[in-house]
Structure formats: C-alpha cells, structure tokens
C-alpha cells in the first residue's frame, strides 16, 4: 500500500495532522516537544483512495534528549519504507534550523515531499508560508490541523500524485487488522503425535490430560503463556470435545478440529511423530495450512524415541521436508516433549514467524526486488508474446500479499509464480512467512 510519512521537529503538530488525516484520535497529542516517540501507522481514505499514514517521532537535532538518536533513526528508516513525505512546520514560529536539517535529509530521496505549514487557520495568515519555499520543495500548503483549514488541499495533492496502480490496489484493501500483543497458536497434528505433551512441556505443568490413547484430551484447552515478554495463547486442538452420539471415527474429528484451529490461529504448530515421519494425514493437514496461507512451524516431536544420531535425525528431517515441500517457509524444530528439549527454540521460531507475517515493505523496495529476480529468469512467453510484470504493491493485512500488475495474468504458470514467490521471500526477508501473489491484468500504455 502507498505509504505517506509525516515528519517534522517536535511540537509542530504532526500528531494532530495525523489524527485529522486518519479521522480518529490515535496519536497522543500534548503541548510538550517529542510526545510521540514511536512510529504510529494507520490507514486513511481520501477521494476513494486508501493509503497508509505514518506518524514519526519528532526530529531532534541535539542528542541531549536520550530519544533523539532513536527518533532520527526512525525518520531515516522511513526514507526507504515510505513513498511520500509530509514535512510539518510551524507557521507561527517560522523557519528554523531544525526544519532545514530535516529538509536536507528528505532531499536525499526523489520521492514526493509536501510541506504543511501548520497553525495557519485563515487566509490573512497565509503569507507566512512563503519563507518555507526556502526548504527547496515546490508543494507548500497552509494548514491548520486543529481547525481543518487547508487539509483538503494537502490531501488532494497527495492523492493526485499516487500512481494509478496504487489507486487500483487500494480498491483491494479491506479493514486494517491490528497486530495483537498475544500470538494465537494452534497445535495441530494427527492423534498421538504428542500435541498435549508438547503443550505441557511448554507450560511446565500437566495442563492437558495425556495418555497413549489417541485423542484423550477431551476439554477445550486455551492457555495463556508468557515467554521473554511475549504472550502466547495456545489452542490445543485435541481438546475440542468429540460428539459422543455419533461415531464418525477419530480421523474425521481430527481433521475437522484442525480446520477450525487453522482458521482461528495466527501461527500453526504442526506436530509430527519422529518415529513415523510425515504421513498421509500429516500431508492433509499441511495442505490445509497451505490453503489458508497460514504461518507455521513444523515440530518433529518424540526425538527421544529414535537413535540420537545426527544421520538419523537428518534423515527424518529430510523426509518431512520432502513430503511437505509445498510449505517450504515453515521452519522445522526437533523436540522431545518428554525431556523438554527444543522448547525454547520452538517459542523463538513461533515469535519470528509471527513477526514476519506482519512485515511490510515499501513499494519501491518491492519493485526493485522483482526487477532483481527477473534479471535471473524472465517469465516464459504466452501465445508468442513476452509476459510482463509492470509493477507491484503490497496489500494491507496478513499474510503478506502482493498485487502484481501484468499484461496476461492467465499466462503466468504455477512453476514460475513459485519461483517468484520463493525468491521474493529470500530477497525481502520473508523466509519464514507464507506470501500470496495476486495478478491483475493491465494494458501497456502506448504513447
């Protein structure tokens, strides 16, 4: 999604303008320099176009404020992530050295910059904007974020400069999903793979009843757990009660419970018995993970039941990876729930996978990555004509979803899209997250 960062020195009204643009009070606003310390991200809609808005912390020249280097780093990071910038300055106070310093940083990029001269709430005050042309940007607007004055003109200019493909992509965007502090984790797997034992090993207590009989956990088990300041809500899928009056068989209910859990969870932990390796039923479960594009961690459990030799463990791991080849992004962790081995590594992987599933990349970064990948391998021709990818953008929400504008969507075959997907994961840092590619047809312009 097109990303616009609001930058400026402390106490010029960045957060007030941010709240005005998104239409709700999300950033804390006080008359104290530097109240907003962290970047706050939200979506906005103007003239039917949806885009992302970032409220950065106030840029501070002096390092006397302990937050100054951090805030400066946040702004400089936005130079890469954002597609455009609104530089907010104070029309009453006038041009300052700090404003010039921020402008100097913004001139490093060739991306659009709009200067919002804030605290101008009537036409008589508009003459105050002229000195700000000294910053070297053409688009300077008098605004009052409190009184709404001039904000419409500013947003009209921003939206007018959004590329056509980003406007089209914004039509695909639904409600923005907020990242939760709690990771919902579904532990899935065929009966007796060790799901409840694994949960107990994580919790360090006998929370779920365990025996050697498949499906012995009868009650719903939703358990909140915290590790290294990260909260997890574990959903032990074996805990959903089986219908007592209808005997459809264990596998029927196992798959049914798994499907519900996969839809609900943020991260799936797919537990596989080390003695059996990946079975046909494990393949069915993994296909559900793939179908719903869910982040996942594959756990090869019960390694205490196989010879503790590296060649044996590698053979098991390779068998699982080969059979579940269609979810290559899911990291594999080898555990012994009985001996509590591999538990810390599992929790780390769950956290990494979750964070990657929320990762966003800027439009420029994405298109540079695609250009780099296409230099390695061009898409095949279609009906004698070359297939082309004109540009791409990341849509809102998770899992990461990229909309590609191409000339012939039907010509892009699965093997090439898989090549593109795998390389995008590597280049953009989504190695542990599933990504989706959507294709939209677009005619090539002829000038």
UniProtKB/Swiss-Prot annotation:
GO terms for biological process: ribosome biogenesis. Associates with the 50S ribosomal subunit. Residues 2-166, 183-358 form the EngA-type G domain. Belongs to the TRAFAC class TrmE-Era-EngA-EngB-Septin-like GTPase superfamily. EngA (Der) GTPase family. Keywords: GTP-binding, Nucleotide-binding, Repeat, Ribosome biogenesis. Pfam families: KH_dom-like (PF14714), MMR_HSR1 (PF01926). PROSITE patterns: G_ENGA. It comes from Persephonella marina (strain DSM 14350 / EX-H1). InterPro entries: G_ENGA, GTP-bd, GTPase_Der, KH_dom-like, KH_dom-like_a/b, P-loop_NTPase, Small_GTP-bd. This is GTPase Der. Residues 359-443 form the KH-like domain. GTP 1 binds at residues 8-15, 55-59, 118-121. GTPase that plays an essential role in the late steps of ribosome biogenesis. GTP 2 binds at residues 189-196, 236-240, 301-304. SUPFAM superfamilies: P-loop containing nucleoside triphosphate hydrolases. One of its GO terms (molecular function) is ribosome binding.
């Amino acid at each position: 999604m097109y990303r616009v960062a609001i930058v400026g020195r402390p106490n010029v009204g960045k957060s007030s303008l941010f709240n005005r643009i998104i239409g709700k009070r999300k950033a804390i606003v006080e008359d104290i320099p530097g109240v907003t310390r962290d970047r706050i991200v939200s979506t906005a809609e103007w003239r039917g176009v949806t885009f992302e808005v970032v409220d950065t912390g106030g840029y501070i020249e002096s390092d006397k404020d302990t937050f100054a280097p951090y805030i400066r780093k946040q702004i400089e990071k936005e130079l890469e992530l954002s597609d455009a910038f609104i530089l907010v300055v104070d029309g009453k106070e006038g041009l300052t050295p700090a404003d010039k310093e921020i402008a100097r940083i913004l001139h490093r990029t060739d991306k659009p910059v709009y200067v919002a001269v804030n605290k101008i709430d009537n036409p008589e005050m508009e003459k105050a904007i002229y000195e700000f042309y000294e910053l070297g940007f053409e688009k300077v607007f008098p605004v009052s974020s409190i009184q709404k004055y001039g904000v419409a003109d500013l947003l009209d200019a921003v939206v007018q400069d959004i590329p056509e493909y980003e406007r089209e992509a914004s039509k695909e965007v639904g409600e923005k999903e907020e990242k939760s502090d709690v990771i919902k984790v579904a532990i899935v797997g065929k009966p007796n793979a060790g799901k409840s034992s694994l949960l107990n090993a994580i919790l360090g207590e006998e929370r779920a009843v365990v025996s050697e009989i498949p499906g012995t956990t009868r009650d719903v088990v939703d358990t909140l757990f915290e590790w290294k300041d990260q909260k997890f809500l574990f959903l032990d899928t074996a805990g959903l009660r089986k219908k007592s009056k209808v005997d459809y068989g264990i596998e029927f209910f196992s798959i049914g419970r798994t499907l519900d859990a996969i839809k609900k969870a943020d991260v799936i932990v797919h537990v596989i018995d080390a003695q059996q390796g990946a079975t046909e039923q494990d393949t069915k479960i993994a296909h559900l993970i793939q179908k719903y594009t869910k982040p996942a961690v594959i756990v090869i459990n019960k390694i205490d039941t196989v010879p503790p030799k590296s060649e044996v463990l590698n053979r098991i791991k390779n068998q699982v990876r080969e059979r579940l080849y269609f979810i290559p992004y899911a990291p594999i962790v080898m555990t012994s729930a009985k001996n509590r081995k591999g538990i810390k590594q599992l929790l780390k992987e769950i956290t990494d996978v979750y964070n990657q599933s929320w990762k966003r990349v800027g439009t420029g970064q994405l298109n540079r990555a695609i250009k780099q990948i296409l230099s390695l391998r061009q898409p095949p021709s279609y009906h004698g004509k070359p297939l082309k990818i004109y540009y791409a953008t990341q849509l809102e929400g998770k899992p990461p979803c990229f909309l590609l504008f191409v000339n012939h969507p039907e010509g892009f075959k699965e093997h090439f899209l898989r090549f593109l997907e795998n390389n995008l994961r590597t280049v953009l840092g989504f190695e542990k997250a599933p990504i989706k590619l959507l294709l939209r047809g677009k005619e090539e312009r002829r000038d």
